[in-house]
Amino acid sequence: MIMNMKNIFYCLLPGLLLGACSNKVYEKTGDSVIVKVQHKETGGPRLVRLQVMGDKLIHVSATADSKFADPQSLIVVPQKKQTSFAVVQNGDTITVSTEEVKASVLASTGEVWFTDKNGELILQENKGGGKTFTPIEVEGTKGYTVCQVFESPEDEAFYGLGQHQADEFNYKGKNEELFQYNTKVSVPFVVSNKNYGILLDSYSFCRFGNPNDYSQLNRIFKLYDKTGQEGALTGTYVPKKGETLVRREDSIYFENLKTIENLPKKLPLMGAKVTYEGEIEPAQTGEFKFILYYAGYVKVYLNNEPVVPERWRTAWNPNSYKFAAHLEAGKRVPLKIEWQPDGGQSYCGLRALTPVNPEEQGKQSWWSEMTKQLDYYFMAGENMDDVISGYRSLTGKSPVMPKWAMGFWQSREKYNTQEEMLGALKGFRDRKIPLDNIVLDWNHWPENAWGSHEFDKARFPDPKAMVDSIHAMHARMMISVWPKFYVTTEHFKEFDENGWMYQQSVKDSLKDWVGPGYHYGFYDAYDPDARKLFWKQMYEHYYPLGIDAWWMDASEPNVRDCTDLEYRKALCGPTALGSSTEFFNAYALMNAEAIYDGQRGVDNNKRVFLLTRSGFAGLQRYSTATWSGDIGTRWEDMKAQISAGLNFAMSGIPYWTMDIGGFCVENRYVAGQKQWNATKTENADYKEWRELNTRWYQFGAFVPLYRAHGQYPFREIWEIAPEGHPAYQSVVYYTKLRYNMMPYIYSLAGMTWFDDYTIMRPLVMDFTADAEVNDIGDQFMFGPSFMVSPVYRYGDRSREIYFPQAEGWYDFYSGKFQAGGERKVIEAPYERIPLYVRAGAIIPFGDDIQYTDEKPAEHIRLYIYQGADGEFTLYEDEGVNYNYEQGMYAMIPMKYDEATKTLVIGERQGEFPGMLKERTFTVVTVNKEKAQPFDLNAKGVTVKYNGSEQTLKL
């Protein structure tokens, strides 16, 4: 039940400020202040509460009821009660003050605003209160559809919200629907360039920006077909064989299994070509925002201009793309959609939102379909890192990942036999290509036994020996585990007899795509006992084999592809906590809790690693990374992963990855691979496939987790290109470089725990004062030192780069200096990605290794990029256990002073079992006068280090 808010963009309380209240209108209770709203309007709050969570953290609650419901938060961990704050009433304004921030409530409306300790405004709710409550009842449970709006200055920018696929970076003035789906991970948290964050504590379907649903075209436009007749567009359906069908279409809405029934009944979509064309006439002037939903190939033309160049997505996992157009009231504009469906079942839709006043569109607006009360957390910071630190203090710290997780991961859909998997690993070792992890995807079980956690003995005759062999080759193994169970398995029955299995798919006799199709269900991860059973079954079947990591697939949960929203809710509910309308988005968080708590409960000395296809606020506390799902193998998909990964990082969850090369493969690439296999000739498509993978690997080497995966063609580099090919050479170069960088990378992993650091960083995090970076979503920092600029267009051998305002930058490959505050077109040959190092960087590089724990880093090359002061802390621990939580780790602080050209390698702090007592540093300097390329054999100043402070004049 989605609230109908016709033509309302922001949630405006119409009440006027009716004067000051002379009486005390608040109640202080421990760590909170409750304000009774004096002039409640229909749909407004009756109570507003400010709860102090820390000097920079304020929890705001509001309710339209006479008391707060206070449901248990799924995302906020238990907090120490804060009582050190002051409360002052001045007229009808009640102000709560900590040492760092002030939060005020206007008792006449419930409006809240936040300032720093000096009274400078940080954030203000929409004038008049900005909060509305509309009653909703689902499955006998009452709640509210809520909306919260904040004022926003013109120069503000917003980041976060999880990771989405529309290739949007700065969400200022944008709209995003927050729900979980394959390739779409929603996190209700944003960070502002004004150095604050807002976390909405809601688990239902939400919207950021315009709270209205996109409308069918005929509801906001007059439609004209290609002959000029009013009332519809013209739909022309040309099958591969047979007669062309032409009919009038009053909407383009074929977006799910239900609505594609409205396509022409006798039209075979396979090989068809479809055109929707005519004219649209708006009733008002302004910017209309469109959303295109597509599977197959699609193009969109508006006013005879291409507004959506060709895009593609596989039929079973459609994608959305957004665009905007300024249209004038009463003026007819040509519209044309060209669609080539993918397969016999495919999807296409185009909907739109009517214009909104730009000032209102630019505000920060949140809408939640169902919640008991409004709850959000305000966190202020000195910078964006400080804001994210506040987020993690609320939702949980991010543990140090196992060191091997920072190496290279090889995966494919899928290794069908034990021999295939071991053969792939042996291929890396024989070719001396570094690797730490190999992955076994779904379908390693007997065909009719999904969820049994058993191996198909014909294909995997000895799983324990397989895992042992992987370990003997100094690699780790991750295995795919789903929350899905065939109804015939004992595991399903064990859940079902306790009432812990979602029933709708069973009642509807849904079958999956395997073999003849099998009946199945998903377990309810919201039930704590069900979570314990989920881990117990994994522990009994998988854990004794020595498996190192867990791949939580379909954790949205994606019970069935391509269903409408209401049926999706039916398939994943009711939950143990309530209706799936209220608890729609947090499944992956609950599922991750099952594995993390389960493994730490049985083996607290082995670091947990989870990779999940979905996520939610707080996911980081369960040692869980997210990958961006089953994305397409297209250049536009590769580009979209840059902004997706950056916004996911800004959502407070530091570990993210993607399928390098994309998952779903266009048929032309498959045909190119088969031609190569048969004839060793490279056609145009296969040439592009190789370049696409090369550019994607170059990008992937600089994200938190470096991982290749996808459907056929196989993704091992020697399957993509032979050893002498530039694609092969480039991928091997960056894989080896990743391992040379391991002292740097693992130190970043340590910083995520100790300093709440973010590894993959949009430029705005480090250069907030430089307004030029606010909208740059295709460059990023990898840690404090490297600026990465992926190449994402076929055939490009250069790209424009903005160099943020800093003391300077150095080309990593040549060592040449580049000034900051400039835009330049930089060469990007096939084999190289533009990579620059910030002046002041101190970067530790290790020797060539084949896996992360091959040997201790006895010799480290310290590259000092002069031109600015710099510092870095080398972090080390045992790499595989939780002893660091007990203080068993070592840090070596390093500082460079530009004025004196002095490097101080500080006294080592801490120790751990197996720690190197002594090592050698070779210090290599790079400066404007000496363009020193990166070279492991470069000469420098050698220092013997035994843990005592060393000072070097450079």
From Swiss-Prot:
<feature type="active site">
    <location>
        <position position="556"/>
    </location>
</feature>
<feature type="signal peptide">
    <location>
        <begin position="1"/>
        <end position="20"/>
    </location>
</feature>
<feature type="lipid moiety-binding region" description="N-palmitoyl cysteine">
    <location>
        <position position="21"/>
    </location>
</feature>
<dbReference type="GO" id="GO:0061634">
    <property type="term" value="F:alpha-D-xyloside xylohydrolase"/>
</dbReference>
<dbReference type="GO" id="GO:0030246">
    <property type="term" value="F:carbohydrate binding"/>
</dbReference>
<keyword id="KW-0326">Glycosidase</keyword>
<keyword id="KW-0997">Cell inner membrane</keyword>
<dbReference type="Pfam" id="PF21365">
    <property type="entry name" value="Glyco_hydro_31_3rd"/>
</dbReference>
<keyword id="KW-0624">Polysaccharide degradation</keyword>
<dbReference type="InterPro" id="IPR013780">
    <property type="entry name" value="Glyco_hydro_b"/>
</dbReference>
<comment type="function">
    <text>Catalyzes the liberation of alpha-xylose from the non-reducing terminal glucose of xyloglucan oligosaccharides in xyloglucan degradation, converting the 'X' to 'G' units.</text>
</comment>
<dbReference type="InterPro" id="IPR051816">
    <property type="entry name" value="Glycosyl_Hydrolase_31"/>
</dbReference>
<feature type="active site">
    <location>
        <position position="553"/>
    </location>
</feature>
<keyword id="KW-0564">Palmitate</keyword>
<dbReference type="Pfam" id="PF17137">
    <property type="entry name" value="DUF5110"/>
</dbReference>
<keyword id="KW-0449">Lipoprotein</keyword>
<keyword id="KW-0378">Hydrolase</keyword>
<dbReference type="Pfam" id="PF13802">
    <property type="entry name" value="Gal_mutarotas_2"/>
</dbReference>
<dbReference type="Pfam" id="PF01055">
    <property type="entry name" value="Glyco_hydro_31_2nd"/>
</dbReference>
<dbReference type="InterPro" id="IPR017853">
    <property type="entry name" value="Glycoside_hydrolase_SF"/>
</dbReference>
<dbReference type="InterPro" id="IPR037524">
    <property type="entry name" value="PA14/GLEYA"/>
</dbReference>
<dbReference type="InterPro" id="IPR000322">
    <property type="entry name" value="Glyco_hydro_31_TIM"/>
</dbReference>
<dbReference type="GO" id="GO:2000899">
    <property type="term" value="P:xyloglucan catabolic process"/>
</dbReference>
<protein>
    <recommendedName>
        <fullName>Alpha-xylosidase BoGH31A</fullName>
        <ecNumber>3.2.1.177</ecNumber>
    </recommendedName>
</protein>
<feature type="lipid moiety-binding region" description="S-diacylglycerol cysteine">
    <location>
        <position position="21"/>
    </location>
</feature>
<comment type="similarity">
    <text>Belongs to the glycosyl hydrolase 31 family.</text>
</comment>
<dbReference type="InterPro" id="IPR011013">
    <property type="entry name" value="Gal_mutarotase_sf_dom"/>
</dbReference>
<dbReference type="InterPro" id="IPR033403">
    <property type="entry name" value="DUF5110"/>
</dbReference>
<dbReference type="GO" id="GO:0085030">
    <property type="term" value="P:symbiotic process benefiting host"/>
</dbReference>
<dbReference type="InterPro" id="IPR048395">
    <property type="entry name" value="Glyco_hydro_31_C"/>
</dbReference>
<feature type="active site" description="Proton donor">
    <location>
        <position position="630"/>
    </location>
</feature>
<keyword id="KW-0732">Signal</keyword>
<comment type="pathway">
    <text>Glucan metabolism; xyloglucan degradation.</text>
</comment>
<feature type="domain" description="PA14">
    <location>
        <begin position="227"/>
        <end position="366"/>
    </location>
</feature>
<dbReference type="InterPro" id="IPR025887">
    <property type="entry name" value="Glyco_hydro_31_N_dom"/>
</dbReference>
<keyword id="KW-1003">Cell membrane</keyword>
<dbReference type="GO" id="GO:0005886">
    <property type="term" value="C:plasma membrane"/>
</dbReference>
<keyword id="KW-0472">Membrane</keyword>
<dbReference type="GO" id="GO:0004553">
    <property type="term" value="F:hydrolase activity, hydrolyzing O-glycosyl compounds"/>
</dbReference>
<keyword id="KW-0119">Carbohydrate metabolism</keyword>
